[in-house]
Amino acid sequence: MLVVALDTSTDMLACACAEWTATLDGGGVELLSHQDHMCRRHANVELVNAVDAALQDAGASMDKVGAVLVGRGPGSFTGVRIGISTAKGLARGAGVPLYGVSTLDASAWTAWRAGVRGLLGVAADAMRGEVYPALYSVDEDGPHRLFERERVVKAAVAVEEWSSRPDCDELQITGDGLVRYAKLFEEAGLMERVLDRELWWPSGEGLLLAAASSRVMLHDQSGDPAQVLPVYTRLSDAEENERKRLGLAQSAKSEVTGVADELAGRHLQFRPMGPADAEAAAELEATCFADASHTPWSPQQFMSELASDAAAPRSWWVAHDNGELVGIAGGMAIDTDVEILDVAVAPDRRRQGIARKLLSHVSYDVQMLGCTTASLEVEANNGTAIALYESLGFSRSGVRRGYYGTGADACIMTATLPLVLPVDATSPEPTAAASRPWPLPEPRRSDAERRLLEESSLVMAIESSCDETAVAIIDAAGRMLANQVSTQIDFHARFGGVVPEIASRKHVEVIVGVVDAALEEAAASLGLADPVAPGELAAVGVTQGPGLVGALVVGVAFAKGFAFAAGKPLIAVNHLEGHLYANLLTTPDLEPPFIFTLVSGGHTMLVHVRAWGDYEVLGETLDDAVGEAFDKVAKALGLGYPGGPIISRLAEDGDPKAIDFPRAMMHSHDYRFSLSGLKTAVVTYIEQEAAAGRTIHLPDLAASFEAAVFDVQFKKAWDALKQTGAKEYCLGGGVAANPHLRELLVRKLSRRGVRVTLPPQHACTDNAAMIAEVARRKYREGDYAGFDMDADPNMTL
């Protein structure tokens, strides 16, 4: 079987092709070609072309590949995601298995191939003064791990651990961590047996040898590309900081004076447990298990679970509503298994998906800490709980007699992580891929169905610029056959905004599942029984920018791998142009010239569209974007995230003239915007009312804030229409979904003889339908991108 191996977790782009032959002990590897080379910060530009070159050197092509192998890290966060996203795209586009292997193991096998034998230490660079340390015993059969799982430590700690070993004089060291921390190792006398510098990085052959030895291609992994995830050794900085903050918190409730009462009960929210939750958690436990054999936990037990010096890592989450704790779940990570310690949901809040959401968050945390399996005990007669766990992928593996007391047995259940959690807009949980046979069978098509697909010229588009993973499929006539979105709001809400690190992780986890859902939906729209296959598409479009760079690279890398493997052209799409084209979903006959206002979380701009592709940006915001201002005001009020929809709902019952907030730059005689002054005015008002002991009437504040923003938007738009002579006006961006802004613009501009086009509300926030419309037109014009395309976070119109 022909296998392509790749890794970009370090500055080395490792890429190789080999013939793999199954054997009883794992497999034999015959290296055919390699394209290993240093590519610092250019992996996303060079990787697909390196795969192409390696295949050509091997006298093969992608349609001959039987499997793809990828390094899962640990390593550079961005590098690992580029490699895994590209590999997922290659495997899904070609319909072949994808397998993952530790980059540390690949480095050890690279040393073995060079003749290294004995005690070997790999110190991979983890940045921030840290390394990923790994010790191996290397003999003629290969490297053997002397550690349970990957971890991250300060470089000085690794040096101390290794230099204090009684056999340290036998230790040979390698790894790209030596580039940054050589002095530390040298001062400890560990550089005397350092390997040659060219061996400090993993090679393509090392990946192949590591995979063969670990039997990953002999049923140790399913081969489903949706299931392959990076090796993470720590939570994101935002998550770590949040845990520290909660550890110091005195109360889990909102302390915003004057608004707490009005906020109570507006949202069911999920967040990590803090010490302030211990009493309520114990009370909830006692209520939930009042009639069970299980002994409820005490507040002291919960406090000990949250201690920073706990012997094993913990993850505890709570669900709260109306200032009341309504659910808890927690687990303890031991080696690569998480033991689920407790799950409890208030009796009147059951069957609402709360337990599933809580377990999804616990599962996600421990996956980031290296866990690959989960286990738990549940009362054998608790059929409801057992059914829930079975739906998540747990299976019964044993019984503990009398575990909860005489005659009260415990059913032992185990599961492989990630849990079976559906990927959809209402359940944005980690890696929603259910276990399934892979590769998928070839679709069965009649001649008429094949003609239909060929005539339809289906274009698939991928959007990943921020916190939505979206995929849409459009036909040649502009009919939207599929439109799938997986949102991450639950994972960012507790931080009051999008955390780029988490957004990037989530895209990697769900992108295959969202693509699968779109291919199935498109088939159903065409009346086909089997999902659309990658080879039945005409082209693949993807958002190139602007956006969060870590989020963009996932979509771009996946799309490039997918298009290359499927043999389809690649189309680069400007996200801002996508928001403009979203108006065509409502008004297909829309033609320039017209004025376009973009109002989103990242952009506020006024554009004169002279022709398709010919855009004059008349003015932009000098500081905060409109959506950003909404989020910041909502955060100041303790309303939660995202702020736009919450403020909009409050404003429905408010008086827009109740508070006279400033209209910044309304009479500046240009098309620039500024929102920071308005934001400051709102915060000042909140502080003044709090100091006076007055309760803030949130609907009035929300309506007055909206009016201050929207009055300026209308004034600038009308001035631009008069200056340019345009008779049509369009709106776009997440804030374009606001019903009050839509009504105001239609009412005021229509009476002035302007035709107003608004995108469908579902197409205002980030989605792939608008990207698909741009990609369809570019496909028709033959406007394709090369496989050296990279994400452009600063792209402009």
Tell me what each language-model feature is:
Residues 366-377, 400:
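Conserved GNAT acetyl-CoA-binding A-motif
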Residues 246, 251-260, 531, 649-729, ...:
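A contiguous, well-structured pocket-lining segment that forms one wall/lid of small-molecule binding clefts
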Residues 183-188, 218-223, 445-465, 472, ...:
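A short helix-loop
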Residues 376-385, 402-407:
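Conserved beta-strand-loop-alpha-helix junction that forms the acyl-donor binding cleft
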Residues 272-276, 282-348, 359-369, 416-418:
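Acetyl-CoA-dependent GNAT
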